[in-house]
Every structure is written in C-alpha cells, then in structure tokens.
Amino acid sequence: MINLRKTHPLMKIINHSFIDLPAPSNISAWWNFGSLLGICLMIQILTGLFLAMHYTSDTLTAFSSVAHICRDVNYGWLIRNLHANGASMFFMCLFLHVGRGIYYGSYLYKETWNIGVILLLTVMATAFVGYVLPWGQMSFWGATVITNLLSAIPYIGTTLAEWIWGGFSVDKATLTRFFAFHFILPFIITALVIVHLLFLHETGSNNPSGINPDSDKIPFHPYYTIKDTLGLMILLLVLLSLAYSLSDLLGDPDNFSPANPLSTPPHIKPEWYFLFAYAILRSIPNKLGGVLALLASILILLIIPLLHTANQRSMMFRPISQTLFWILTANLITLTWIGGQPVEQPFIIIGQLASMSYFLLIMVLMPLAGLFENYMLEPEW
C-alpha cells in the first residue's frame, strides 16, 4: 500500500515539515516556542474572527459593541478574554523565542533571523492597531501619542500623521482603517511564518551546543510532537487561568471608560509588551531622537549577526557572554518596569541609564566578550 503522507502533493509538504523532519536529538524545551507561537497565532485568528462578527468599527458604537460582546453574546466574554490575554501569551512566547535565538546563536541562520525580525515588527503593528479597537480611554490616547510620533519625521511628518489618521486627529476614519489593518495583518503574518519555516528547513534547526547536528538526528514525530504537546498544555493552562480568573490583570483600568478626546489620562502607557520600547522612547528628551531610539531598539536585532565575534556559535560554553546576556535580560525587565512608571525622578534617570545600557550591551560589550573568550581559548593558555 502506498503511504499517502509520503506521496500526496500536499501531505508530502506537511510530512517533510512536521512528521519525518530530521531534528537534532538534543534540542531543549527552549525550542518549544516556535510551535507555541504557531498555536497562539491560530488562537488569535479564531477568537478574532468571532469577535469581528459582533464588533462595529465606529467611534459611536465601538465601545458599546465590545460591552455587548461581553454581556450578550454566548461566551463572548470568554472569546474576548482569550483574545486579549492570548496577545500577552503571544508576546511572552515571542520574547522567549528571540532570547533563545540570541543565547544559542540561532541568528547565524541569517534569512530565518531576518524574516523573524520582520515577523516581530508585523506582530507589534498588529497588536498596536488591535489595542485601539475597543475605543477606551487608553486605546484612544495610546493611538494619539504613538501615531503623533510620525510628525517628528522632518518635512513629511505632519502630512504623514494626518494621512494615517484620515483627518486632523484620531477619529472615526482612524478607527475604521485600524480595524481593516488588524483584520488583514494576521494573514500576512501567517504567510511570513510559512517563509520563516521555509528558510529554517533549508538549514535545519540549531541546537544548544551550536555544533552541526547532522550526525545525530531523530524524526520530529513522535519525539518532538510529544514534547511540544507538553509545552502546549502549559501554555493553555496559563492562558485559561488568565482568561477565566485574572482577565483584567494585564489590561489598563482606563479602558473601562469610553474614549474622551477632552480628558487626558494622568499617565498614558501602552500594553506591557511595548513598555521596554516606550521607556527607551521616553528616555530621550528630543522627539525625533526618541523615535529613532524606539526604532533602533527593535531594528538592532537585524545587526546582531554582524556583531557575532566568538568562534563558538552558542553561549552554552561562554560564561562571560552568558553573564552579559542575563544582565541584558534584567535590563529589559527594568525598562519594562520604567515604561509603566510616571515621568518623574528617579524613574527618568533609571530609564536613561537602562536605555544606554541596552545599546551598550548589544553593540559593544557582547562583541568584546566574544573576542575575549576567543583569546582565552587560544592554545598557549
């Protein structure tokens, strides 16, 4: 009998990607996050589709349509809670996935890494426009503050901001187009994910040792399907715990009030997963400088492969680089905390120091550590 999964044109692609895929035998739980991100994307698209069936993208009815979903639609409260907290889980997995890539030198697969950075930017754009849709106070003011940053661009800034708004401020036209963007972007993300996987399967997965694993590979199924299922169970446990019991833990209380252009909240801040970049933006007193620093904080990921100086790929056997990596992690947590604090001392100076440390660590200290570790490994020692 012909094995259909190995001969059918469509099944063959799935088979080579998820079933008979040769995978390194030593990849750890840090390699689970790719599949978890795929699951998160599916959850977000499904819950988002059901929310879009009941949501209206009009400034007069957007807020009440979200209230209607939570009160009158069957399990609408659950769908909304899963979607809102699913975004947090998505970003948690994303940050861990990127961190794994930096720690184990996965960025040396340059095509996969670059598509991954584009994916990160696209997911951030999707989350931003999605945050505006409930049309609460923080939704409105967050959209106003962030889109207004475009006006810092010389010559074309003001025109560009008004073009994005569809008027002279954030209003009905802005909400309608943001809903359109929020609906289409996840499908663009799905296409990019396929390209990401395509490039990954050209080279095969990296592994914790950073050594070529071709001599010791095992089939993806059943070994890693079982392993990924454990990760999925933990993800669902956390997501459902948030959605059922702590649904408003990661949200902003200001979003319980409808958007009011005449009343500014005392402290405008985005969702927690943007706070590190927001802190970097605020740490520079100049508007254009802040916007450039904000962009640089994400786009710096693109030059990480160029800053790799070590002879070893992974940080597994490089204690100095490991130490700097965990300092960078602590630094990002500090930036996230600062982004949620009011603009006053001592938070201003802490934010400025943490922002400076962020760029210093990635661009100077980590490449120098790689060179020093090479020197320490030379035979005369």
UniProtKB/Swiss-Prot annotation:
Heme b b562 binds at H83, H182. PROSITE patterns: CYTB_CTER, CYTB_NTER. Pfam families: Cytochrom_B_C, Cytochrome_B. It is a multi-pass membrane protein. GO terms for molecular function: metal ion binding; ubiquinol-cytochrome-c reductase activity. One of its GO terms (biological process) is mitochondrial electron transport, ubiquinol to cytochrome c. It is found in: Mitochondrion inner membrane. The chain crosses the membrane at residues 33-53, 77-98, 113-133, 178-198, 226-246, 288-308, 320-340, 347-367. Its main location: mitochondrion. GO terms for cellular component: mitochondrial inner membrane; respiratory chain complex III. A ubiquinone binds at H201. Binds 2 heme b groups non-covalently. InterPro entries: Cyt_b/b6_C, Cyt_b/b6_C_sf, Cyt_b/b6_N, Cytb/b6-like_sf, Cytochrome_b, Cytochrome_b_C_euk/bac, Cytochrome_b_N_euk/bac, Di-haem_cyt_TM. Keywords: Electron transport, Heme, Iron, Membrane, Metal-binding, Mitochondrion, Mitochondrion inner membrane, Respiratory chain, Transmembrane, Transmembrane helix, Transport, Ubiquinone. It comes from the Eukaryota. Heme b b566 binds at H97, H196. Its cofactor is heme b. Component of the ubiquinol-cytochrome c reductase complex (complex III or cytochrome b-c1 complex) that is part of the mitochondrial respiratory chain. The b-c1 complex mediates electron transfer from ubiquinol to cytochrome c. Contributes to the generation of a proton gradient across the mitochondrial membrane that is then used for ATP synthesis. The cytochrome bc1 complex contains 11 subunits: 3 respiratory subunits (MT-CYB, CYC1 and UQCRFS1), 2 core proteins (UQCRC1 and UQCRC2) and 6 low-molecular weight proteins (UQCRH/QCR6, UQCRB/QCR7, UQCRQ/QCR8, UQCR10/QCR9, UQCR11/QCR10 and a cleavage product of UQCRFS1). This cytochrome bc1 complex then forms a dimer. Belongs to the cytochrome b family. Heme 1 (or BL or b562) is low-potential and absorbs at about 562 nm, and heme 2 (or BH or b566) is high-potential and absorbs at about 566 nm. This is Cytochrome b.
